[in-house]
Amino acid sequence: NYIYSGHNYHQ
């Protein structure tokens, strides 16, 4: 799943 942190996406 993807998590949006501030201005970056993490898989």
Curated annotation (Swiss-Prot):
UniProt PTM comment: The N-terminus is blocked.
Regulation: Inhibited by Cu(2+) ion, nitrogen and cobalt. Activated by reducing agents, such as DL-dithiothreitol and 2-mercaptoethanol.
EC number: 4.2.2.-
pH dependence: Optimum pH is 7.2.
Main EC class the enzyme belongs to: lyase
Keywords, sorted A to Z: Heparin-binding, Lyase
MF (Gene Ontology): heparin binding; lyase activity
Temperature dependence: Optimum temperature 45 degrees Celsius.
Keyword Lyase tagged: yes
Lyase is among the record's keywords: yes
Range of residues in the leader sequence: none
Subunit relationships: Monomer.
Purpose: Degrades acharan sulfate and, to a lesser extent, heparin and heparan sulfate.
Protein name: Acharan sulfate lyase 1
